[in-house]
Amino acid sequence: MYKLLLTLLVSIPLIAHDHSAEKPTFPGLISSEVFNLGNDMVMHVERRNSCNQDGTPKHFHPAAGTLVYVLDGTSQSKSSGSWKEYTKNEYWFEKSDWVHGGEADTPSLPEGTCQQLLVIRVAEEGKEHTVFID
């Protein structure tokens, strides 16, 4: 009886975990830091490395804006209104609340395309800096 009870107690968390409720995320997150800027503002700095990444889940940033800098490789964005490829030492800016990601017209990058990105975002302290949309 003791073994049965112990087995049930250990198994419940495994059964109860709902994988479908996991939040979407960006691939290849290497590091993420938050810096207090004062006046209830923070700066999020993320570094990402990924390969064969044509797009991201649909989302927006309720932040003052987002700067994405390509440290190495090739990435792409539609922030200018049409798709553009960005390579090493180039960057783009994403305005606040711009819904993007998951676009049907996202171009495929060639197989083996890798990117190293530095993402800098200023947001209000205590608020989400990225909101994923189902």
Where are the language model's segments positioned?
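A short beta-loop-beta micro-motif enriched in histidine and acidic residues
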Residues: 51-66
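Histidine-centered metal-chelating micro-motifs
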Residues: 55-57, 76, 92-108
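Short acidic-glycine-tyrosine-enriched beta hairpin
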Residues: 37-40, 49-50, 79-99
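Ligand-binding loop in jelly-roll beta-barrel domains
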Residues: 97-128
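Extracellular/periplasmic catalytic domains that process cell-envelope and extracellular macromolecules
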Residues: 38-39, 61-62, 69, 84-85, ...
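Glycine- and acidic-residue-biased ligand/ion/polar-headgroup-sensing regions
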Residues: 63-81, 90
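Flexible, surface-exposed loop/linker segments and immediately adjacent secondary-structure boundaries
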Residues: 38-45, 88-91, 112-117, 122
